[in-house]
Amino acid sequence: TEILRLMASGFSNKEIANSLGVAEGTIKNHVSNILSKLGVRDRTRAVLKAFELQLV
């Protein structure tokens, strides 16, 4: 949910990676998994769905 929270704050993958101290590729993988698990196709819809489900 930390990555979702940062996505909701408008952070890019690179900014999230820097914030968490991991590689940008790691964040890309996590974002891809988040989109898949939420059943959405883009970051905006993922954030909206996360709010609907009260994940953030």
Regions found by a protein language model. Give the residues of each.
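Pre-recognition alpha-helix immediately N-terminal to the DNA-recognition helix
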Residues: 1-2
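Phosphate-coordinating loops and pocket residues in cytosolic domains that bind phosphorylated ligands
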Residues: 5, 28, 52
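Short helix-to-turn junction characteristic of helix-turn-helix DNA-binding domains
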Residues: 7-11, 50
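Recognition helix of helix-turn-helix DNA-binding domains
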Residues: 10-45
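A generic structural signal for secondary-structure junctions
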Residues: 39, 51-52
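Short C-terminal tail/terminal secondary-structure segment
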Residues: 54-56
